[in-house]
Amino acid sequence: MSRVCQVTGKKPMVGNNRSHAKNSTRRRFLPNLQNHRFWLEGEKRFVKLRISTKGMRIIDKKGIEVVVAELRARGEKV
């Protein structure tokens, strides 16, 4: 399973660890992904999404029905 948010599309970024001596080593910054189950009232069923915490805030703002409709319009299977 890839580390990509289904709502926002957030992916891992690359950057550097910095030691006290300013040495740099490459590292990955991973998005804060959560597996979450949402109830779709219109379909009377649960939907499982792998979303970031930012995606959860978007769902709180817009509503799960609107977000799922946008995902389906993009061609994602939900």
Curated annotation (Swiss-Prot):
CC annotations in GO: cytosolic large ribosomal subunit
Pfam families: Ribosomal_L28
Biological process according to GO: translation
Region of interest (Disordered), ranges: 1-23
Transmembrane segments: none
Domain of life of the native organism: Bacteria
Claim: Ribosomal protein is one of the keywords in the record: yes
Keyword hit for NAD: no
Protein keywords: Ribonucleoprotein, Ribosomal protein
GO molecular function, one term: structural constituent of ribosome
Protein family (similarity comment): Belongs to the bacterial ribosomal protein bL28 family.
HAMAP family in the record: Ribosomal_bL28 (MF_00373)
PANTHER family per the UniProt record, alphabetical: 39S RIBOSOMAL PROTEIN L28, MITOCHONDRIAL, LARGE RIBOSOMAL SUBUNIT PROTEIN BL28M
Name of this protein: Large ribosomal subunit protein bL28
